[in-house]
């Protein structure tokens, strides 16, 4: 899959489009094919100044998409459900600036 990442703080010029493995949902998680990734002030402020907690970060907290896979313990009838994502990058390495995102129901 494709994802936007940054490896250092700075303006939008630090963003890079890269290839990454498509995430597989873990127990209790769903995988969302992201259709829309929203950018809000929290996203660009974090990219500009917040110390990185890992070597690279996929930005953006908000988005929407469709569940395309479920992990163990999740009803497979959820596949095809349209969902809204919020705080997807909060305390995680992966935000919504990617083609796919795995998250727990009700929490990213």
Q: Which residue ranges define each predicted feature?
A:
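Conserved catalytic-core motifs of eukaryotic protein kinase domains, centered on the activation segment
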Residues: 44-46, 96
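Residue-level marker for the onset of beta-strands and adjacent loop->beta junctions
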Residues: 16-18, 53, 97
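Conserved hydrophobic "DFG−1" position in protein kinase catalytic cores
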Residues: 5, 22, 46, 102-103
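Glycine-rich beta-strand-centered segment in the early N-terminal region that forms part
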Residues: 21-38, 47-89
